[in-house]
């Protein structure tokens, strides 16, 4: 067995509802690529691996290419995608989109970022709402016993909040109920497209019920909110997993 460290692999994320329309002009079979699948192909006559993945909650793709090819691919996408509205963006934009789509980001939604006053850091899949990542009853993997032991012992839940108005929750804003802090908002955003003001928050289990009234204590002032299930956008994943 040999191990070779190679940093000559670049990742370009190409996201949006028209991404498949653009790619279908250059990549044969791209419409048949299932959600979370990948294919070895070429783009602009350059070798790439294209995956049906992304971090936006929208239909999208990622291109894994050689470092020397990345600038060419990037420039061609921006230039030839301009008529369809293609523009470059940065991770800050993705950070806002993930709030709508319930895409967690370590450590920013975890106790490593917001440690407990009276408990050790570290979160369970049950607390994060990620227990679906383990097949029910599956055993034999590292941490299996601990995973099942902690079921039903959640100290908190990661859950959504829907705020009033258009002022988004501050990152790290205290989540208040009956005048006491009960949690923290890990990320918030107001969507001018979907016209909702939403956030991901850590809160007590008994508060993680749709309609629970709370208050987000922003630095600029308090904002009323209600607990809301996630994702807020495309909850059935019909857009990101669409066929054809």
Regions found by a protein language model. Give the residues of each.
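Conserved, structured C-terminal
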Residues: 1-244
